[in-house]
Amino acid sequence: KIIAKEPCIVAGLEVATAVFRTVDENLVVTAHCQNGDLLANKQMILEVSGSARSILKAERVTLNFLGRMCGIATLTRKYVDQLAGTKAQLLDTRKTTPGLRILEKSATVVGGARNHRFGLSDGVIIKENHIRAAGGITIAVERLSESLPPTIKIEVEVSNLQEAQEALDAGAELIMLDNMSLAEMEMAVRTIRGRALLEASGNVTLENVRQVAETGVDFISTGAIIHSSRWADLSLLFEV
């Protein structure tokens, strides 16, 4: 059986099952909880019966996936809990482990966040380097507007109120407030409210995410829920 050795949010049950069944299709895997459940210390996650050799072969890979995904879901839930009572929604980012993006981003959803882009094809964000290469926010938005289907929204990353106003005037439907102070974010919300969606990003921590949400932004994105999460402490124990 696999047990939690500390309180955590469960994520990755289907991945764990797939690992065991890939190693040996005759293994019987029984989950004792559901993704998203909060487990107590020493609570059982799943039970596996069958060949001891097969179970041991799959043990480390299974625990690696589960530990990583449970850790992400657990930290994400802590962030989401801080947003209770505000309208802000938590978003993940593309700062993921190479090869594991789908699994890591699925774990943030289990924890209560929403997925931002999986890749560049999922949406358009005009960032600092794009703006410099194009020669300015307005021209960057205009060029994209000419080539994009009308169903795709354009988001622009800005670092101050002047840039936020320019992005709005250029036609951006989403504006990312990057590394702006709480006071600047509050001013941006008052100025832009209802005319574009606002996303706060940069230096978001568990300690300040509530304050960021209270500025009135629509979304808060942070890579920390993935890249700074700690693996959940899990263990596989044999019973004969």
Descriptions of predicted regions:
Residues A224-V240:
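Short, charged, intrinsically disordered terminal tails
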Residues K1-A170, L174, E186-T191, R195-E199, ...:
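Acidic/glycine-rich phosphate/pyrophosphate-binding loops and surrounding catalytic core
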